[in-house]
């Protein structure tokens, strides 16, 4: 393979750091250059004094990092000076450089002392390539494979080979893996799918490539139609696409990476080889299919709930207006009643004629309303809601029905009849007549029968369709599942296979390193119950102390009342001290941070094979500042000498969630190494983190943007969940403003890839749920939420009594159901181990 085809893995600075002599401090010199008896004997066996010193230095370097070096004398003269002054006291030596043969002889002794082998392509190359091929199935990123190669060499006691050697091997592994997948697709793919992919790339098919990449930005019918178009065009290809990708055994990370290539190349995808086109498009089709299905489901749920809420609002307003109108029509009702005593009316007249005169005074509906008013009754809100649904026939037959027909439902024990009814409804609506003809009356409650059945007991089929739609949203919490959509599928789909769990349960528990999960439930529950009783007693004792300043127990009238003390504001928002510090530009701060951490190097090119030079350093800084200040690259281009096209290209090449996360970890890891970091700990040797959501108004509509009058007024926005430890933002996730923050607390902790691992986590009330207490405890975290209304929480959870000596006694109001925990302990273990493996 030509050198130009080798992937660029390390930057020049990283190459110098790995393949150059390490920079030892005085403490490092004392540690790495100390010799045992065997090492000292071999060093003294060399006749040339300079080579003895060089052996000690290279041996110390090899202990620090197992790399074969051939440094110049002036590069290591300080370490040589330390050796002949401290380790092997002597007169020193004149400047010299080792010849290749002398270097090889010295390293033979180093390998002997360290029990290592020199890298040899013939002996070790094939085994390393096989190992990297296995690793590539999980993640083909060159840096990941490079780290895996270093780890393999360390485990096999092999000196790290030259950078060019690893470049060549990794390039070959990546190339062979893609060639293998392309060859498999050539053999296994049907001719029809090959033609469809070719038409997609060339733009000659019924679905243009540009239209495939377009996705819905909100829940309007126009936007959701984009997802429906994609669904209709690729639906019949998806079984074969899923089968092909399953035979390739691609990891989720690899599949996502390959799918992103389609967005990166865009119309330029046709310049790639046919095999690469197939691979990228198949991965993209599966990802796009999942996205389309999820948005179709979200859109269906949104419109059903919105219609139900609008129907409720309409019904309440209609009933109120009807009541007001009835009150105004009481006088006209008197005229209707007067007809029965009017002497001018012939008694022989048919009642129909009199009735017609009455209806000329008041309509039938108004007359009914007056009757209800006189009886102090109101029209049923439910009736008005169904009348509203009757008026929304176009929505039901149009958008909702199209979305509904794209979904496949499965039920559990309590929803099998509903799932069967939904499937039957879909079959009938997909038929030639496209009409719903049958209904399962077993699903109707006694209350709903009044509005879904006519006077003769026949079901109102249009209302029945609405009834089915309204049953779906609230049952997607596990009662009903959508097996084709990750977000709505059954819990078992995300757990370890049941058969595999039964056979390998104890092995999996040991590999998870969860001490609590491996214990017997009865023993664990007894131990935790004792700890809880002890803790409740200690809290009671603490509250009795006179110097307790953290919580107020009684008010002046003697009534028990729990609240936090309100602290007065003694500090200024803008302390005058900070006015003495000179102002520094954000770009200068970023340059300083990059100088100390090198985080810019984390922004690798999306293709991986590009040079890792720093020629785009200033452009990346401009992009980061522009996006962070919500100005975007367009706003940055307007106020700088960078063009929009230039910034847009660099952003597409370098700025991704993966690289942004790596850069953030780089800065956080460097921060954690600073001596001052531990002084921010609230408790000694304990990292106390917090998680909370910040609300940001969004300029563009996406599927995550939601209305929230409290935070955005009439606009839409998102919530940015951030995990903070000692003022370092170690992880973040953007969620919808309508989503509960507590659902993402565990995910923030588990997806944290930095070296800062929290011990304690605090959230506000919005981050609390019962599951988080159990999960975080099982995974070794301490959950310590901070409640806004602490008095209400204490009164809801605890009974506070006093014994004969008037000492406080705390106990739970609702006892913990330990029997249920023990009964479902196997399921709890399976869920926890499954989460650990994610």
Positions of PLM-derived features:
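Electropositive nucleic-acid engagement tracts
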Residues: 611-612, 629-688
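Long amphipathic alpha-helical coiled-coil/heptad-repeat bundle
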Residues: 2-529
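Short, conserved catalytic/metal-binding motifs centered on acidic residues
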Residues: 66, 636, 689-695, 745, ...
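Structured, charged N-terminal subsegments at the starts of enzyme catalytic cores
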Residues: 530-639
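Short, basic/hydrophobic alpha-helical segments
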Residues: 741-760
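C-terminal catalytic or substrate-handling cores of phosphate/nucleotide-
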Residues: 751, 756, 770, 774-838
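A short acidic (Asp/Glu
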Residues: 71-73, 647-650, 659-660, 699-702, ...
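Active-site cores of enzymes that catalyze phosphoryl transfer or operate on phosphate-rich substrates
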Residues: 674-741
